[in-house]
């Protein structure tokens, strides 16, 4: 059976709204229009306007309302049309949702999911293309999820909605329409468990979200040169499955990290730091990080392509750590 990522997310929200009447969806155009990317399709008809709530264009307003509802015991799912617009709600996410459980000595919980597309799509320019994975992962009190497959989107969304504290669920606009094989039943997937999608012995490639496809395609390409890549899909960035990464590096002795976001203070830099500390003696080559270029993403399609990680970038990094002549 195959379903799209869009359907997987919708099914997860639908199941949790049936299971728990405290769950509700709020955001711009989530009700009548059924979501900017049709992720909330059919939910208004099934659950009504009290649980699927259209809002004005005011992220600061509806995010704050949702955080307050979570403090009061409800379980909001906040949809941002894009995480670029969540910048307007950053104060509520960081200073209220993420910190209150700690500041209250564990007395106040904030069971809320902030979800929507993150990162580049196709020619939506610099202000609509930023990747916030590293930004949110930097903040104590937030769990950060960035899946690739439909099964993982659904399983991790089920877990996110049931979590008693805030989860930032980073989706990808291009992935919404992608179809994946899924089992008949998808159970909640625990946070902090990476998935080895391809076993190998020559080099470890660690990545997440839509970059997983780049990694798999690159791994298949270099197989022709007898380079056997192990590809790890992180699925959750925080908590990070450090153990799976370290054990893989101990086996392959080489590491390439692929992320769409910027290099400086990025996810790749954090992973490289951890591996250098925990598995330095196992490394046979310097760690390579493939990332987006250090500039606002251009609108022109040729420049946009050059600014984002590509399959050839991953292939070059893999060959470099294997000391293979390029």
UniProtKB/Swiss-Prot annotation:
It comes from the Bacteria. Transmembrane segments: none annotated. Keywords: Oxidoreductase, Pyruvate, Thiamine pyrophosphate. The gene is pdhB. SMART domains: Transket_pyr. Thiamine diphosphate binds at residue 59. GO terms for molecular function: pyruvate dehydrogenase (acetyl-transferring) activity. The keyword Oxidoreductase applies. Its EC number is 1.2.4.1. SUPFAM superfamilies: Thiamin diphosphate-binding fold (THDP-binding), TK C-terminal domain-like. Heterodimer of an alpha and a beta chain. It catalyses: N(6)-[(R)-lipoyl]-L-lysyl-[protein] + pyruvate + H(+) = N(6)-[(R)-S(8)-acetyldihydrolipoyl]-L-lysyl-[protein] + CO2. Its cofactor is thiamine diphosphate. This is Pyruvate dehydrogenase E1 component subunit beta. The pyruvate dehydrogenase complex catalyzes the overall conversion of pyruvate to acetyl-CoA and CO(2). It contains multiple copies of three enzymatic components: pyruvate dehydrogenase (E1), dihydrolipoamide acetyltransferase (E2) and lipoamide dehydrogenase (E3). The keyword Thylakoid does not apply. CDD domains: TPP_PYR_E1-PDHc-beta_like. InterPro entries: THDP-binding, Transketo_C/PFOR_II, Transketolase-like_Pyr-bd, Transketolase_C.
